[in-house]
Amino acid sequence: MKRNLFVTFLLGISILSSSCQSGSGKHANVSRDAGYTVGKVIGIIDGDTYDLLIEGNKTIRIRMDGIDAPERGMPFYKVSKNYLAKLCFKQQVRFKAEGKDVHNRNLGFTYLSDGSEVGHLMVKAGMAWHFKKYNSDKELANLEIEARNARRGLWYDKNPMAPWENRKLHRQGISTKGSFNIQPGQE
């Protein structure tokens, strides 16, 4: 009887200690079981897209949901890209998939080891827009308003061109390279 109680006690301690491990290292499967993919950021494409090295030495391209950052050739592109690198390059992150985008990139939310969501940090710092067309997160909307009011990051320019406007003009054959204040209808 005492032996069975002791074995049960040891088994309970073992289960409890394994369930308390974080998803930040050798117990990556704990996070994956909770709907997350754990990996290391190995490449920064721009301010809203990066490459994640996951289990099996596989690389997946991630497009952060809810935000849109300046595209290559747009003002503030390098600053936004470098800020994302500062936040997560060579860091282990947790990725929560929401699906695929039109370019077949993995779309979702990225979390740092402290639990911060990277897209929220990018918008708060004025390094990206809240992508309202595809995301209705009120916190992201408020973070964008705060960054705009404080003139942080890209909001230092009174009227920066949003990436979706840049893409629209590009599809129409209109170059926006080096243009900070072009507005729809002013082409």
Each model region followed by its residue ranges:
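Small beta-barrel nucleic-acid-binding modules, primarily SNase/OB-fold domains
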Residues: 2-187
